[in-house]
Protein backbone atom coordinates (compact mmCIF):
# COMPACT_ATOMS: atom_id res chain seq x y z
CA UNK A 1 0.00 0.00 0.00
CA UNK A 2 2.25 2.78 1.21
CA UNK A 3 5.37 1.07 0.00
CA UNK A 4 4.71 2.75 -3.35
CA UNK A 5 6.84 5.40 -1.71
CA UNK A 6 9.85 3.29 -2.60
CA UNK A 7 8.84 3.06 -6.24
CA UNK A 8 8.41 6.77 -6.87
CA UNK A 9 11.03 9.42 -6.34
CA UNK A 10 10.37 12.10 -3.72
CA UNK A 11 9.78 14.60 -6.45
CA UNK A 12 6.92 12.51 -7.79
CA UNK A 13 5.40 12.24 -4.34
CA UNK A 14 5.91 15.94 -3.94
CA UNK A 15 3.99 16.70 -7.14
CA UNK A 16 1.38 13.92 -7.04
CA UNK A 17 2.92 12.70 -10.27
CA UNK A 18 2.59 9.30 -11.85
CA UNK A 19 5.84 7.87 -13.22
CA UNK A 20 7.68 10.69 -14.97
CA UNK A 21 11.15 10.95 -16.37
CA UNK A 22 13.79 13.12 -14.71
CA UNK A 23 13.12 16.15 -16.90
CA UNK A 24 9.37 16.05 -16.25
CA UNK A 25 9.98 15.66 -12.52
CA UNK A 26 12.34 18.63 -12.49
CA UNK A 27 9.76 20.68 -14.40
CA UNK A 28 6.84 19.76 -12.13
CA UNK A 29 8.85 20.44 -8.96
CA UNK A 30 9.92 23.72 -10.57
CA UNK A 31 6.27 24.56 -11.29
CA UNK A 32 5.42 23.93 -7.63
CA UNK A 33 8.28 26.17 -6.41
CA UNK A 34 7.37 28.90 -8.91
CA UNK A 35 3.79 28.84 -7.65
CA UNK A 36 4.92 29.37 -4.05
CA UNK A 37 7.14 32.23 -5.23
CA UNK A 38 4.36 33.94 -7.21
CA UNK A 39 1.98 33.61 -4.27
CA UNK A 40 4.55 35.15 -1.94
CA UNK A 41 5.15 38.13 -4.23
CA UNK A 42 1.41 38.78 -4.42
CA UNK A 43 1.02 38.57 -0.63
CA UNK A 44 3.88 41.03 -0.12
CA UNK A 45 2.04 43.42 -2.44
CA UNK A 46 -1.24 42.93 -0.54
CA UNK A 47 0.51 43.57 2.78
CA UNK A 48 2.50 46.51 1.37
CA UNK A 49 5.82 45.01 2.45
CA UNK A 50 9.01 46.57 1.11
CA UNK A 51 11.81 44.38 -0.22
CA UNK A 52 13.57 44.07 3.15
CA UNK A 53 10.34 43.27 5.04
CA UNK A 54 9.46 40.71 2.37
CA UNK A 55 12.77 38.92 2.97
CA UNK A 56 12.17 38.73 6.71
CA UNK A 57 11.77 35.08 7.66
CA UNK A 58 9.20 35.88 10.38
CA UNK A 59 6.92 37.51 7.78
CA UNK A 60 7.44 34.52 5.51
CA UNK A 61 6.34 32.14 8.27
CA UNK A 62 3.17 34.14 8.95
CA UNK A 63 2.22 34.22 5.27
CA UNK A 64 2.95 30.49 4.92
CA UNK A 65 0.81 29.70 7.96
CA UNK A 66 -2.04 31.79 6.56
CA UNK A 67 -2.21 29.79 3.34
CA UNK A 68 -1.95 26.46 5.19
CA UNK A 69 -4.77 27.51 7.47
CA UNK A 70 -6.89 28.71 4.51
CA UNK A 71 -6.67 25.25 2.93
CA UNK A 72 -7.09 23.20 6.11
CA UNK A 73 -10.54 21.87 5.22
CA UNK A 74 -11.10 19.65 8.23
CA UNK A 75 -10.18 22.35 10.69
CA UNK A 76 -12.20 24.97 8.83
CA UNK A 77 -15.25 22.70 8.93
CA UNK A 78 -14.68 22.05 12.63
CA UNK A 79 -14.34 25.76 13.39
CA UNK A 80 -17.59 26.50 11.61
CA UNK A 81 -19.44 23.79 13.53
CA UNK A 82 -17.91 24.70 16.91
CA UNK A 83 -17.71 28.49 16.92
CA UNK A 84 -15.45 29.81 19.66
CA UNK A 85 -15.67 33.32 21.04
CA UNK A 86 -13.57 35.92 19.28
CA UNK A 87 -12.42 33.60 16.49
CA UNK A 88 -13.79 34.12 13.02
CA UNK A 89 -13.66 30.72 11.28
CA UNK A 90 -13.61 32.42 7.88
CA UNK A 91 -10.54 34.56 8.60
CA UNK A 92 -6.86 33.86 9.04
CA UNK A 93 -3.89 36.03 9.91
CA UNK A 94 -0.89 36.58 12.11
CA UNK A 95 1.91 38.97 13.01
CA UNK A 96 3.54 40.98 10.23
CA UNK A 97 6.68 42.93 11.08
CA UNK A 98 7.50 46.32 9.57
CA UNK A 99 10.21 48.95 10.02
CA UNK A 100 8.72 52.17 11.37
CA UNK A 101 11.03 55.06 12.28
CA UNK A 102 14.03 52.77 12.65
CA UNK A 103 12.15 50.33 14.90
CA UNK A 104 10.52 46.99 14.23
CA UNK A 105 6.79 46.99 14.97
CA UNK A 106 4.36 44.11 15.02
CA UNK A 107 1.11 44.49 13.14
CA UNK A 108 -1.61 41.84 13.37
CA UNK A 109 -3.27 41.25 10.01
CA UNK A 110 -6.51 39.42 9.24
CA UNK A 111 -7.65 38.13 5.84
CA UNK A 112 -10.59 36.20 4.47
CA UNK A 113 -9.50 32.60 3.92
CA UNK A 114 -11.44 32.72 0.66
CA UNK A 115 -9.28 35.65 -0.49
CA UNK A 116 -6.04 33.81 0.42
CA UNK A 117 -7.24 30.72 -1.46
CA UNK A 118 -7.99 32.91 -4.49
CA UNK A 119 -4.48 34.44 -4.45
CA UNK A 120 -2.87 30.99 -4.03
CA UNK A 121 -4.86 29.44 -6.88
CA UNK A 122 -4.16 32.41 -9.12
CA UNK A 123 -0.42 31.98 -8.47
CA UNK A 124 -0.74 28.27 -9.31
CA UNK A 125 -2.59 28.50 -12.64
CA UNK A 126 -5.98 27.99 -11.02
CA UNK A 127 -4.98 24.75 -9.26
CA UNK A 128 -5.26 23.96 -5.56
CA UNK A 129 -1.58 23.00 -5.86
CA UNK A 130 -1.61 20.67 -2.86
CA UNK A 131 2.01 19.75 -3.56
CA UNK A 132 3.06 23.33 -2.85
CA UNK A 133 1.14 23.31 0.42
CA UNK A 134 2.84 20.07 1.47
CA UNK A 135 6.20 21.58 0.57
CA UNK A 136 5.50 24.47 2.96
CA UNK A 137 4.44 22.00 5.67
CA UNK A 138 7.71 20.10 5.30
CA UNK A 139 9.69 23.35 5.61
CA UNK A 140 7.84 24.12 8.86
CA UNK A 141 8.43 20.56 10.04
CA UNK A 142 12.17 20.78 9.30
CA UNK A 143 12.34 24.06 11.20
CA UNK A 144 10.58 22.47 14.20
CA UNK A 145 12.91 19.45 14.06
CA UNK A 146 15.89 21.79 14.26
CA UNK A 147 14.47 24.06 16.95
CA UNK A 148 12.79 21.73 19.43
CA UNK A 149 13.54 18.46 21.12
CA UNK A 150 10.53 16.16 21.38
CA UNK A 151 11.48 14.64 24.73
CA UNK A 152 8.08 15.12 26.27
CA UNK A 153 6.20 13.49 23.40
CA UNK A 154 8.58 10.52 23.55
CA UNK A 155 8.27 10.07 27.30
CA UNK A 156 4.47 10.31 27.15
CA UNK A 157 4.31 7.30 24.83
CA UNK A 158 6.82 5.33 26.87
CA UNK A 159 9.82 5.82 24.60
CA UNK A 160 13.36 6.90 25.52
CA UNK A 161 13.93 10.66 25.07
CA UNK A 162 17.38 9.92 23.67
CA UNK A 163 15.71 8.45 20.61
CA UNK A 164 15.09 11.91 19.18
CA UNK A 165 17.06 11.14 16.00
CA UNK A 166 14.06 9.03 14.95
CA UNK A 167 11.61 11.92 15.28
CA UNK A 168 11.91 13.70 11.94
CA UNK A 169 8.58 15.10 10.78
CA UNK A 170 6.91 14.63 14.17
CA UNK A 171 5.04 17.94 13.83
CA UNK A 172 3.80 17.37 10.27
CA UNK A 173 0.02 17.56 10.00
CA UNK A 174 -1.78 14.34 9.08
CA UNK A 175 -2.88 15.80 5.78
CA UNK A 176 0.63 16.02 4.39
CA UNK A 177 0.17 13.11 1.97
CA UNK A 178 2.79 10.80 0.47
CA UNK A 179 5.50 13.45 0.40
CA UNK A 180 4.94 14.01 4.13
CA UNK A 181 4.97 10.27 4.89
CA UNK A 182 8.32 9.91 3.10
CA UNK A 183 10.09 12.37 5.41
CA UNK A 184 8.69 11.00 8.67
CA UNK A 185 11.20 9.22 10.87
CA UNK A 186 10.64 5.75 12.32
CA UNK A 187 9.97 7.24 15.77
CA UNK A 188 7.33 9.57 14.38
CA UNK A 189 5.41 6.69 12.79
CA UNK A 190 5.73 4.60 15.97
CA UNK A 191 4.45 7.50 18.06
CA UNK A 192 1.40 7.96 15.81
CA UNK A 193 0.63 4.24 15.96
CA UNK A 194 1.04 4.02 19.74
CA UNK A 195 -1.30 6.99 20.22
CA UNK A 196 -3.85 5.23 18.04
CA UNK A 197 -3.55 1.92 19.92
CA UNK A 198 -3.87 3.72 23.28
CA UNK A 199 -7.09 5.33 22.12
CA UNK A 200 -8.36 1.91 21.14
CA UNK A 201 -7.54 0.56 24.60
CA UNK A 202 -9.35 3.41 26.33
CA UNK A 203 -12.32 3.77 24.00
CA UNK A 204 -14.31 0.61 23.33
CA UNK A 205 -15.85 1.96 20.15
CA UNK A 206 -12.67 3.18 18.52
CA UNK A 207 -12.36 0.16 16.20
CA UNK A 208 -16.12 -0.44 15.88
CA UNK A 209 -18.81 0.52 13.41
CA UNK A 210 -18.45 2.50 10.20
CA UNK A 211 -15.97 4.92 11.78
CA UNK A 212 -13.98 2.06 13.22
CA UNK A 213 -13.61 0.58 9.76
CA UNK A 214 -12.03 3.81 8.52
CA UNK A 215 -9.83 3.88 11.63
CA UNK A 216 -8.69 0.34 10.88
CA UNK A 217 -7.80 1.23 7.30
CA UNK A 218 -5.80 4.22 8.54
CA UNK A 219 -4.05 1.99 11.10
CA UNK A 220 -3.03 -0.55 8.48
CA UNK A 221 -1.90 2.16 6.11
CA UNK A 222 0.35 3.69 8.78
CA UNK A 223 1.74 0.23 9.54
CA UNK A 224 2.58 -0.22 5.87
CA UNK A 225 4.28 3.16 5.68
CA UNK A 226 6.42 2.22 8.69
CA UNK A 227 7.11 -1.25 7.30
CA UNK A 228 8.34 0.39 4.08
CA UNK A 229 10.88 2.38 6.09
CA UNK A 230 12.51 -0.71 7.60
CA UNK A 231 15.27 -2.39 5.63
CA UNK A 232 15.61 -5.80 7.27
CA UNK A 233 13.30 -8.77 6.83
CA UNK A 234 12.90 -9.32 10.58
CA UNK A 235 11.79 -5.73 11.19
CA UNK A 236 9.34 -5.94 8.28
CA UNK A 237 7.97 -9.24 9.60
CA UNK A 238 7.34 -7.71 13.01
CA UNK A 239 5.46 -4.88 11.31
CA UNK A 240 3.25 -7.39 9.49
CA UNK A 241 2.42 -8.87 12.86
CA UNK A 242 1.53 -5.48 14.34
CA UNK A 243 -0.62 -4.69 11.31
CA UNK A 244 -2.52 -7.98 11.30
CA UNK A 245 -3.35 -7.92 15.00
CA UNK A 246 -7.10 -8.46 15.51
CA UNK A 247 -7.30 -6.13 18.47
CA UNK A 248 -4.19 -3.96 18.83
CA UNK A 249 -3.14 -3.54 22.45
CA UNK A 250 -0.16 -3.55 24.80
CA UNK A 251 1.63 -6.36 22.97
CA UNK A 252 1.66 -4.21 19.82
CA UNK A 253 2.86 -1.17 21.77
CA UNK A 254 5.74 -3.30 23.09
CA UNK A 255 6.63 -4.51 19.62
CA UNK A 256 6.56 -0.96 18.24
CA UNK A 257 8.75 0.37 21.06
CA UNK A 258 11.17 -2.50 20.42
CA UNK A 259 11.24 -1.68 16.70
CA UNK A 260 11.83 2.01 17.38
CA UNK A 261 14.83 1.14 19.55
CA UNK A 262 16.14 -1.25 16.94
CA UNK A 263 16.03 1.60 14.39
CA UNK A 264 18.83 3.36 16.28
CA UNK A 265 21.21 0.81 14.79
CA UNK A 266 19.20 -0.83 11.97
CA UNK A 267 18.11 2.53 10.62
CA UNK A 268 15.03 3.08 8.53
CA UNK A 269 14.95 4.83 5.18
CA UNK A 270 13.74 8.36 5.72
CA UNK A 271 13.68 10.92 2.91
CA UNK A 272 15.35 14.31 3.25
CA UNK A 273 14.22 17.29 1.23
CA UNK A 274 15.54 20.80 1.19
CA UNK A 275 12.40 22.90 1.56
CA UNK A 276 13.09 26.63 1.77
CA UNK A 277 10.95 29.45 3.15
CA UNK A 278 8.64 31.23 0.70
CA UNK A 279 10.71 34.42 1.07
CA UNK A 280 13.52 32.63 -0.80
CA UNK A 281 11.35 31.52 -3.73
CA UNK A 282 9.51 34.87 -4.06
CA UNK A 283 12.51 37.13 -4.77
CA UNK A 284 13.96 34.49 -7.14
CA UNK A 285 10.75 34.53 -9.18
CA UNK A 286 10.61 38.33 -8.98
CA UNK A 287 14.12 38.55 -10.41
CA UNK A 288 12.88 36.69 -13.48
CA UNK A 289 14.05 33.16 -12.73
CA UNK A 290 11.71 30.59 -14.33
CA UNK A 291 11.73 27.55 -12.04
CA UNK A 292 9.53 25.45 -14.30
CA UNK A 293 11.62 26.10 -17.41
CA UNK A 294 14.95 25.64 -15.61
CA UNK A 295 13.73 22.66 -13.58
CA UNK A 296 14.37 22.12 -9.86
CA UNK A 297 15.19 19.25 -7.52
CA UNK A 298 14.81 19.12 -3.75
CA UNK A 299 17.59 16.59 -3.29
CA UNK A 300 20.36 17.88 -5.54
CA UNK A 301 22.38 21.04 -6.03
CA UNK A 302 19.44 23.41 -6.70
CA UNK A 303 18.55 24.43 -3.12
CA UNK A 304 22.25 25.03 -2.38
CA UNK A 305 22.59 27.26 -5.45
CA UNK A 306 19.44 29.15 -4.51
CA UNK A 307 20.64 29.75 -0.95
CA UNK A 308 24.06 30.96 -2.21
CA UNK A 309 22.42 33.99 -3.82
CA UNK A 310 19.49 34.61 -1.47
CA UNK A 311 19.27 37.40 1.08
CA UNK A 312 17.12 36.38 4.04
CA UNK A 313 16.79 38.43 7.22
CA UNK A 314 15.62 37.53 10.69
CA UNK A 315 14.55 39.37 13.80
CA UNK A 316 17.00 38.84 16.67
CA UNK A 317 16.16 39.06 20.38
CA UNK A 318 18.52 41.01 22.69
CA UNK A 319 20.61 38.07 23.94
CA UNK A 320 20.58 35.93 20.82
CA UNK A 321 23.60 35.28 18.62
CA UNK A 322 22.88 36.01 14.92
CA UNK A 323 25.41 33.37 13.81
CA UNK A 324 23.57 30.79 15.91
CA UNK A 325 20.22 31.86 14.47
CA UNK A 326 21.76 31.39 11.02
CA UNK A 327 22.87 27.87 11.89
CA UNK A 328 19.37 26.99 13.07
CA UNK A 329 17.81 28.12 9.79
CA UNK A 330 20.61 26.61 7.68
CA UNK A 331 19.97 23.22 9.27
CA UNK A 332 16.23 23.57 8.69
CA UNK A 333 16.72 24.54 5.04
CA UNK A 334 18.93 21.50 4.48
CA UNK A 335 16.78 19.14 6.54
CA UNK A 336 19.84 18.34 8.64
CA UNK A 337 18.49 18.29 12.20
CA UNK A 338 19.54 14.67 12.73
CA UNK A 339 22.67 14.62 10.58
CA UNK A 340 26.11 14.07 12.07
CA UNK A 341 27.57 17.47 12.97
CA UNK A 342 30.91 16.50 11.44
CA UNK A 343 29.24 16.12 8.05
CA UNK A 344 27.12 19.27 8.36
CA UNK A 345 30.15 21.30 9.42
CA UNK A 346 32.18 20.06 6.47
CA UNK A 347 29.44 20.91 3.97
CA UNK A 348 28.63 24.26 5.51
CA UNK A 349 32.29 25.21 5.79
CA UNK A 350 31.85 26.54 9.33
CA UNK A 351 31.53 24.62 12.56
CA UNK A 352 27.99 23.47 13.29
CA UNK A 353 27.33 23.43 17.04
CA UNK A 354 25.05 21.14 19.05
CA UNK A 355 21.67 22.64 19.97
CA UNK A 356 22.58 23.13 23.63
CA UNK A 357 25.49 25.40 22.71
CA UNK A 358 23.38 27.75 20.59
CA UNK A 359 22.36 31.10 22.07
CA UNK A 360 19.13 31.34 20.16
CA UNK A 361 15.49 30.54 20.68
CA UNK A 362 13.05 29.63 17.92
CA UNK A 363 12.56 31.79 14.84
CA UNK A 364 8.99 32.79 15.62
CA UNK A 365 8.36 35.59 18.07
CA UNK A 366 5.48 35.23 20.51
CA UNK A 367 2.75 37.87 20.49
CA UNK A 368 3.55 38.87 24.08
CA UNK A 369 7.25 39.52 23.48
CA UNK A 370 8.34 43.13 23.68
CA UNK A 371 9.49 44.49 20.30
CA UNK A 372 11.48 47.45 21.66
CA UNK A 373 14.89 45.81 21.83
CA UNK A 374 14.45 43.63 18.77
CA UNK A 375 16.84 44.14 15.86
CA UNK A 376 17.27 42.34 12.55
CA UNK A 377 20.23 40.70 10.92
CA UNK A 378 21.16 38.80 7.75
CA UNK A 379 20.96 35.01 7.94
CA UNK A 380 24.10 33.32 6.59
CA UNK A 381 22.64 30.38 4.68
CA UNK A 382 25.46 29.71 2.22
CA UNK A 383 27.48 26.51 2.08
CA UNK A 384 31.03 25.62 1.09
CA UNK A 385 30.07 22.38 -0.69
CA UNK A 386 26.90 20.60 -1.65
CA UNK A 387 25.95 16.94 -1.30
CA UNK A 388 23.15 14.71 -2.47
CA UNK A 389 20.38 14.14 0.08
CA UNK A 390 19.90 10.51 1.01
CA UNK A 391 16.95 8.32 1.84
CA UNK A 392 18.87 5.22 2.82
CA UNK A 393 19.65 5.60 6.52
CA UNK A 394 23.24 4.74 5.67
CA UNK A 395 23.23 1.16 6.89
CA UNK A 396 26.28 -0.83 5.87
CA UNK A 397 25.38 -4.47 5.17
CA UNK A 398 22.13 -4.06 7.13
CA UNK A 399 23.14 -2.03 10.18
CA UNK A 400 24.56 0.99 11.98
CA UNK A 401 23.63 4.06 14.58
CA UNK A 402 25.94 7.66 17.68
CA UNK A 403 25.98 8.96 21.51
CA UNK A 404 23.85 11.42 23.65
CA UNK A 405 21.33 11.53 20.96
CA UNK A 406 22.52 7.88 20.73
CA UNK A 407 22.05 7.91 16.97
CA UNK A 408 21.85 9.98 13.80
CA UNK A 409 19.64 9.84 10.74
CA UNK A 410 21.94 10.84 7.89
CA UNK A 411 20.79 13.59 5.53
CA UNK A 412 23.68 13.75 3.10
CA UNK A 413 25.06 10.92 1.04
CA UNK A 414 28.65 11.38 2.25
CA UNK A 415 31.14 8.70 3.32
CA UNK A 416 31.64 8.48 7.09
CA UNK A 417 31.32 6.07 9.98
CA UNK A 418 28.11 6.43 11.97
CA UNK A 419 29.32 6.12 15.54
CA UNK A 420 26.90 4.99 18.21
CA UNK A 421 27.10 4.09 21.84
CA UNK A 422 26.32 0.40 21.51
CA UNK A 423 26.28 -0.32 25.24
CA UNK A 424 23.61 2.34 25.80
CA UNK A 425 21.45 1.03 23.00
CA UNK A 426 21.86 -2.67 23.76
CA UNK A 427 21.16 -2.11 27.46
CA UNK A 428 17.60 -1.30 26.45
CA UNK A 429 17.18 -4.82 25.09
CA UNK A 430 18.43 -6.99 27.93
CA UNK A 431 15.95 -9.29 29.54
CA UNK A 432 13.05 -8.08 27.45
CA UNK A 433 12.30 -11.22 25.50
CA UNK A 434 8.70 -11.81 26.47
CA UNK A 435 6.11 -11.31 23.77
CA UNK A 436 5.25 -13.63 20.95
CA UNK A 437 7.95 -12.54 18.59
CA UNK A 438 11.07 -13.79 20.29
CA UNK A 439 12.47 -15.36 17.09
CA UNK A 440 12.23 -12.10 15.15
CA UNK A 441 13.38 -10.20 18.20
CA UNK A 442 16.36 -12.52 18.58
CA UNK A 443 17.23 -12.01 14.92
CA UNK A 444 17.02 -8.21 15.24
CA UNK A 445 19.11 -8.21 18.42
CA UNK A 446 21.68 -10.46 16.72
CA UNK A 447 22.02 -8.01 13.81
CA UNK A 448 22.37 -5.12 16.24
CA UNK A 449 25.04 -6.89 18.25
CA UNK A 450 27.13 -7.54 15.18
CA UNK A 451 27.01 -3.85 14.21
CA UNK A 452 30.33 -2.04 14.55
CA UNK A 453 30.42 1.74 15.09
CA UNK A 454 33.60 2.13 13.07
CA UNK A 455 32.25 0.67 9.82
CA UNK A 456 31.97 3.13 6.97
CA UNK A 457 28.64 4.10 5.41
CA UNK A 458 28.07 5.68 1.97
CA UNK A 459 31.35 4.19 0.74
CA UNK A 460 33.04 6.44 -1.80
CA UNK A 461 30.34 9.13 -1.64
CA UNK A 462 31.56 12.68 -1.23
CA UNK A 463 30.60 16.32 -1.34
CA UNK A 464 30.89 18.50 -4.44
CA UNK A 465 32.09 22.00 -5.24
CA UNK A 466 29.12 24.28 -5.89
CA UNK A 467 30.38 24.77 -9.45
CA UNK A 468 30.25 20.98 -9.98
CA UNK A 469 26.52 20.84 -10.71
CA UNK A 470 26.68 17.51 -12.49
CA UNK A 471 28.34 15.90 -9.45
CA UNK A 472 31.35 14.64 -11.38
CA UNK A 473 34.18 15.04 -8.83
CA UNK A 474 33.27 13.78 -5.37
CA UNK A 475 35.47 15.09 -2.56
CA UNK A 476 35.46 12.41 0.14
CA UNK A 477 36.07 14.07 3.50
CA UNK A 478 38.00 12.28 6.23
CA UNK A 479 36.49 12.56 9.68
CA UNK A 480 37.93 11.93 13.08
CA UNK A 481 36.41 8.50 13.60
CA UNK A 482 36.29 8.72 17.37
CA UNK A 483 34.49 12.00 17.48
CA UNK A 484 30.78 11.59 17.12
CA UNK A 485 28.49 14.50 16.44
CA UNK A 486 24.90 14.59 17.57
CA UNK A 487 22.98 17.83 17.45
CA UNK A 488 20.76 17.28 20.47
CA UNK A 489 23.59 15.82 22.54
CA UNK A 490 23.29 16.68 26.24
CA UNK A 491 20.71 19.18 25.34
CA UNK A 492 18.46 21.84 26.76
CA UNK A 493 16.41 22.78 23.71
CA UNK A 494 12.87 23.95 24.37
CA UNK A 495 10.00 21.55 24.00
CA UNK A 496 7.69 21.79 21.02
CA UNK A 497 4.18 22.69 22.13
CA UNK A 498 1.37 22.83 19.60
Swiss-Prot record:
Compositionally biased spans, kind Basic and acidic residues: 8-21
Keyword field contains Cell membrane: no
GO biological process: symbiont entry into host cell; viral penetration into host nucleus
Keyword Ribonucleoprotein part of the UniProt annotation: yes
Region (Disordered): 1-21
Motif (Bipartite nuclear localization signal): 198-216
Transmembrane region(s): none
InterPro entries, A to Z: Flu_NP
Cellular localisation: Virion; Host nucleus
Keywords (A to Z) from UniProt: Capsid protein, Helical capsid protein, Host nucleus, Host-virus interaction, Ribonucleoprotein, RNA-binding, Viral nucleoprotein, Viral penetration into host nucleus, Virion, Virus entry into host cell
GO MF annotation list: RNA binding; structural molecule activity
UniProt PTM comment: Late in virus-infected cells, may be cleaved from a 56-kDa protein to a 53-kDa protein by a cellular caspase. This cleavage might be a marker for the onset of apoptosis in infected cells or have a specific function in virus host interaction.
Chief subcellular location: virion
An annotated GO cellular component: host cell nucleus
Motif position, Unconventional nuclear localization signal: 1-18
Protein purpose: Encapsidates the negative strand viral RNA, protecting it from nucleases. The encapsidated genomic RNA is termed the ribonucleoprotein (RNP) and serves as template for transcription and replication. The RNP needs to be localized in the host nucleus to start an infectious cycle, but is too large to diffuse through the nuclear pore complex. NP comprises at least 2 nuclear localization signals that are responsible for the active RNP import into the nucleus through cellular importin alpha/beta pathway.
Family: Belongs to the influenza viruses nucleoprotein family.
Assembly notes: Homomultimerizes to form the nucleocapsid. May bind host exportin-1/XPO1. Binds to viral genomic RNA. Protein-RNA contacts are mediated by a combination of electrostatic interactions between positively charged residues and the phosphate backbone and planar interactions between aromatic side chains and bases.
The name this protein goes by in its record: Nucleoprotein
Organism: Influenza A virus (strain A/New Zealand:South Canterbury/35/2000 H1N1)
